[in-house]
């Protein structure tokens, strides 16, 4: 069973230490609920990932662990076969001992769009909400973050993250917790909170923004990336059924409305730093994610529309600062 003891130890003398009052029981319950299903099989795969300390580790410019020269061809093929058990790999890419995991998403492109605009992560305690397999967490660590915590309820994403971490070395100050944000208390402790690709999946986007705010210290920075549509501060799209074949998309605001939501939730210094239409080169099927992808979600006769006739995916990144709490909003 995946252990969280090293995380408990790392936060015992940090700004997150009061989380220890509730977190062990919550994760203990999660472990009991996942004794069956695919998780035990995946954990057996993780236990086979015993490899020499990597001669190269780079999280600054990519996520690269090992040059590829340390393993024989047979060892590398064995590692590739083990990593393939965790398909589909959606967020990446990763270079692991010479194995190039070409994921569905070029998450490095998103990171390069975002990182020039955020406050430096050096020595900051960072939370990544809806972190997926953790690609951006490693890049946050590469920017010098003191602690990086990612939360996502998916057991598969957790195992993908753990596979990378075991190859990188378990002593890294980076941890994945299989939780949704609604399971977190109001920690008021993180210097930076990222929520990228989550808001449009939430039935109540305002509640989600409040939950994000509750994790930040006063003066902390929110990095919020989500799907948007064109329009003014009165514009929002709620799909009648599916959007891009997804049945869990609820609200797509305009940039102006999104900024209004943040202002209403008592954030300050609110600014849009990037708007980008998702390209077919950024999200596509690969051997590591052989299922349907963006091209299958768009109108084959007009890629500016989804198959349902809505505007094709466009993503905005908003940065904002947590203000002093307004008692009228609590």
UniProtKB/Swiss-Prot annotation:
Its EC number is 2.5.1.-. GO terms for biological process: tRNA wobble uridine modification. GO terms for molecular function: methyltransferase activity; transferase activity, transferring alkyl or aryl (other than methyl) groups. It catalyses: carboxy-S-adenosyl-L-methionine + 5-hydroxyuridine(34) in tRNA = 5-carboxymethoxyuridine(34) in tRNA + S-adenosyl-L-homocysteine + H(+). Carboxy-S-adenosyl-L-methionine binds at residues 91, 105, 110, 130, 152-154, 181-182, 196, 200, 315. Keywords: Transferase, tRNA processing. The keyword Transferase applies. Pfam families: Methyltransf_9. The keyword rRNA processing does not apply. InterPro entries: CmoB, Mo5U34_MeTrfas-like, SAM-dependent_MTases_sf. Homotetramer. Catalyzes carboxymethyl transfer from carboxy-S-adenosyl-L-methionine (Cx-SAM) to 5-hydroxyuridine (ho5U) to form 5-carboxymethoxyuridine (cmo5U) at position 34 in tRNAs. Belongs to the class I-like SAM-binding methyltransferase superfamily. CmoB family. PANTHER family: METHYLTRANSFERASE, TRNA U34 CARBOXYMETHYLTRANSFERASE. HAMAP family: tRNA_carboxymethyltr_CmoB. This is tRNA U34 carboxymethyltransferase. It comes from Shewanella halifaxensis (strain HAW-EB4).
């Amino acid at each position: 069973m995946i252990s969280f003891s090293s995380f408990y130890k790392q936060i015992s003398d940090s700004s997150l230490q009061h989380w220890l009052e509730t977190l062990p029981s919550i994760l203990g319950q999660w472990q009991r609920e996942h004794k069956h299903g695919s998780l035990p099989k995946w954990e057996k795969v993780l236990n086979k990932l015993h490899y020499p300390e990597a001669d190269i580790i780079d999280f600054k410019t990519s996520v690269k662990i090992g040059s590829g020269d340390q393993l024989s061809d047979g060892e590398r093929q064995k590692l590739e076969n083990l990593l393939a058990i965790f398909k589909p790999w959606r967020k990446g890419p990763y270079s692991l001992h010479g194995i190039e995991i070409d994921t569905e998403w070029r998450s490095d492109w998103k990171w390069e769009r975002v990182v020039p605009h955020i406050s430096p992560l050096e020595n900051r305690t960072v939370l990544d909400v809806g972190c997926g397999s953790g690609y951006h967490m490693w890049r946050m660590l590469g920017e010098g973050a003191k602690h990086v915590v990612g939360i996502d309820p998916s057991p598969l994403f957790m195992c993908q993250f753990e596979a990378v971490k075991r190859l990188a070395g378990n002593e890294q100050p980076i941890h994945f917790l299989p939780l949704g944000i609604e399971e977190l208390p109001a920690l008021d402790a993180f210097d930076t909170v990222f929520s990228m690709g989550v808001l449009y999946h939430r039935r109540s986007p305002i509640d989600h923004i409040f939950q994000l705010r509750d994790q930040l210290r006063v003066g902390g920075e929110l990095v919020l990336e989500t799907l948007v549509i064109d329009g003014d501060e009165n514009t929002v799209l709620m799909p009648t059924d599916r959007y891009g074949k997804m049945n869990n998309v609820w609200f797509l605001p305009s940039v102006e409305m999104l900024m209004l939501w943040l202002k209403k939730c008592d954030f300050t210094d609110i600014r849009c730093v990037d708007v980008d239409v998702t390209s077919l080169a950024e999200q596509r099927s690969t051997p590591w994610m052989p299922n349907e992808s963006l091209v299958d979600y768009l109108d084959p006769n007009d890629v500016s529309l989804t198959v349902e006739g809505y505007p094709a995916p466009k993503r905005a990144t908003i940065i904002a600062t947590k203000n002093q709490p307004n008692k009228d909003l609590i």
